[in-house]
Amino acid sequence: MELENFVANNLLLKARLGFNKQTGRSKKWRELLKFPPVSMCTELRWSIEKDFSSLCDKQPIGRLLFRQFCDTKPDLKRCIEFLDAVAEYEVTIEEEQREFGLAIFSRFFKEKSEVPLPEIPPDIVKECKWNLKQNSPSQNVFEECAGIVCKYLSETPFEEYQESTYFNRFLQWKWLERRPVTKNTFRQYRVLGKGGFGEVCACQVRATGKMYACKKLEKKRIKKRKGEAMALNEKRILEKLHSRFVVSLAYTYETKDALCLVLTIMNGGDLKYHIYNLGDPGFEEPRAVFYAAELCCGLEDLQRKRIVYRDLKPENILLDDHGHIRISDLGLAMEVPEGEMVRGRVGTVGYMAPEIINHEKYTFSPDWWGLGCLIYEMIAGHSPFRKYKEKVNREELERRVKNETEEYSERFSEDAKSICSMLLIKDPSKRLGCQRDGVSAVKQHPIFKDINFSRLEANMLDPPFIPDPQAIYCRNILDIGQFSVVKGVNLDTNDEIFYAEFATGSVTIPWQNEMIESGCFKDLNENEDDLSSLEKYKMCSSILRPKRNFFRRLFRRTGCLNIALSEEREPTEH
């Protein structure tokens, strides 16, 4: 029995190591990722939405190919260099920001330049210079300048890009992205745990060697529990979210017996394991604060899409290989319509907010309560209303949540006590995060004084703990109970409509990131002869003008600079 677990663990570790060394790819990986002739992409060329933000910013491969196109033209290359510099300025530490900003201004706005930027009104340049000379210039000093550069790129350069071989190559990648996904796309490894409708196991994409977690939803179990709406809701929410602080959905497919969600694999285990199984219960405060800061970013991303999570607890917060956390298991999450409130008594006993227990309406307040519970538990080593290993029935626990005030030990600093007490206020209208300032008020709490959120969101801060790469942070295979066989349920043709809606294949942004991270994009694109051969397929027909011509981030505080930033945080349509 122990031998079975040992073998399964070794196979998984070998597969994980294979991706890091790019040896996990199938020997036939080039055949699996063979580009079609551009002539096969004609329909795709005309059906794809000609949106500059989507094609050249949000989609990672599109972003890289557009940059490669710009590198062939000095004026466009200059624009990209400016956007890169501004993106770097935005994540520069405050002490160095002014000096770095002045260096950018000197480099790109001096009067005599062989390759000047697109014309920017003198009053905007003057205001930019004045702001930079202040002691603490803001992060968005270059916002208007960057917006003008982005608008310039979205017009004639974008049209020229669509007539180039680089866009032809992009269409070939899109063709590969849209191919059907089946169980044969992956290698399957050991079971990692159990979900509500089936097992979760590790899997590996044959073509790239990329490791994922495959969450299997047994078809008969879904039908017996009438879980179709819940399963589809989780899939749709994951599909529209692209946050480094929430697990990503990369693929959906079906087998004869199951619907499968292929998700970010988190090899570092969950917070519950780390709180209670490695030394004394609880963390040192700096570690708890780091995780709390990343959770704030994750909740902000969810709320930006008007999603309330409703199940924050240590088991649902997972660590990746590098020690960063992500929110997982969005089965209870739901979208809150603009201007409305929702009601629903869902969650886990001991972590549910008072307004949920009382059947009251809410928007995002339960998640700020959940964050308070998590911060408290990470520091104290037990949840706010139940001692470690204390046996308490549901009714008593709910009574404590509604009526009692949590107690604080000497492990809590004044700042830690302050944020927990502000997040655990019974009245949601007075709770931290629930007023007009929302997440900004939480981020500005003194406990986060040493956290640079811009750098955190750009993945530029080192975690306080890095999981052991040789460890398997999950239970032994034999300790993970098996599901019983579902009897008395028959699948019919009516179920096929639901299955077709669920199993839609690759998700654009994660799939393209996989191609880049695995090195497949670089390896296949380095063949310049192959790229130049695309010229003979070049289409001479006029290209439709884009319906929108601004970067998405032009409408945000940080400006439209995502072309130079790392992981995209918004979805794009297939």
Curated annotation (Swiss-Prot):
<dbReference type="InterPro" id="IPR011009">
    <property type="entry name" value="Kinase-like_dom_sf"/>
</dbReference>
<keyword id="KW-0808">Transferase</keyword>
<protein>
    <recommendedName>
        <fullName>G protein-coupled receptor kinase 4</fullName>
        <ecNumber>2.7.11.16</ecNumber>
    </recommendedName>
</protein>
<feature type="binding site">
    <location>
        <position position="215"/>
    </location>
    <ligand>
        <name>ATP</name>
    </ligand>
</feature>
<dbReference type="InterPro" id="IPR036305">
    <property type="entry name" value="RGS_sf"/>
</dbReference>
<comment type="subunit">
    <text>Interacts with DRD3.</text>
</comment>
<dbReference type="InterPro" id="IPR016137">
    <property type="entry name" value="RGS"/>
</dbReference>
<dbReference type="Pfam" id="PF00069">
    <property type="entry name" value="Pkinase"/>
</dbReference>
<dbReference type="GO" id="GO:0005886">
    <property type="term" value="C:plasma membrane"/>
</dbReference>
<feature type="region of interest" description="N-terminal">
    <location>
        <begin position="1"/>
        <end position="153"/>
    </location>
</feature>
<keyword id="KW-0449">Lipoprotein</keyword>
<keyword id="KW-0067">ATP-binding</keyword>
<dbReference type="InterPro" id="IPR008271">
    <property type="entry name" value="Ser/Thr_kinase_AS"/>
</dbReference>
<comment type="function">
    <text>Specifically phosphorylates the activated forms of G protein-coupled receptors.</text>
</comment>
<comment type="similarity">
    <text>Belongs to the protein kinase superfamily. AGC Ser/Thr protein kinase family. GPRK subfamily.</text>
</comment>
<feature type="active site" description="Proton acceptor">
    <location>
        <position position="311"/>
    </location>
</feature>
<dbReference type="GO" id="GO:0005524">
    <property type="term" value="F:ATP binding"/>
</dbReference>
<feature type="binding site">
    <location>
        <begin position="192"/>
        <end position="200"/>
    </location>
    <ligand>
        <name>ATP</name>
    </ligand>
</feature>
<dbReference type="InterPro" id="IPR000719">
    <property type="entry name" value="Prot_kinase_dom"/>
</dbReference>
<dbReference type="GO" id="GO:0005938">
    <property type="term" value="C:cell cortex"/>
</dbReference>
<dbReference type="InterPro" id="IPR017441">
    <property type="entry name" value="Protein_kinase_ATP_BS"/>
</dbReference>
<keyword id="KW-0418">Kinase</keyword>
<feature type="domain" description="Protein kinase">
    <location>
        <begin position="186"/>
        <end position="448"/>
    </location>
</feature>
<keyword id="KW-0597">Phosphoprotein</keyword>
<keyword id="KW-0963">Cytoplasm</keyword>
<keyword id="KW-0723">Serine/threonine-protein kinase</keyword>
<dbReference type="Pfam" id="PF00615">
    <property type="entry name" value="RGS"/>
</dbReference>
<keyword id="KW-0547">Nucleotide-binding</keyword>
<dbReference type="InterPro" id="IPR000961">
    <property type="entry name" value="AGC-kinase_C"/>
</dbReference>
<dbReference type="InterPro" id="IPR044926">
    <property type="entry name" value="RGS_subdomain_2"/>
</dbReference>
<dbReference type="GO" id="GO:0005829">
    <property type="term" value="C:cytosol"/>
</dbReference>
<dbReference type="GO" id="GO:0007165">
    <property type="term" value="P:signal transduction"/>
</dbReference>
<feature type="domain" description="AGC-kinase C-terminal">
    <location>
        <begin position="449"/>
        <end position="514"/>
    </location>
</feature>
<dbReference type="GO" id="GO:0031623">
    <property type="term" value="P:receptor internalization"/>
</dbReference>
<keyword id="KW-0564">Palmitate</keyword>
<keyword id="KW-0007">Acetylation</keyword>
<feature type="modified residue" description="N-acetylmethionine">
    <location>
        <position position="1"/>
    </location>
</feature>
<feature type="modified residue" description="Phosphoserine">
    <location>
        <position position="484"/>
    </location>
</feature>
<dbReference type="InterPro" id="IPR000239">
    <property type="entry name" value="GPCR_kinase"/>
</dbReference>
<feature type="domain" description="RGS">
    <location>
        <begin position="51"/>
        <end position="171"/>
    </location>
</feature>
<dbReference type="GO" id="GO:0004703">
    <property type="term" value="F:G protein-coupled receptor kinase activity"/>
</dbReference>
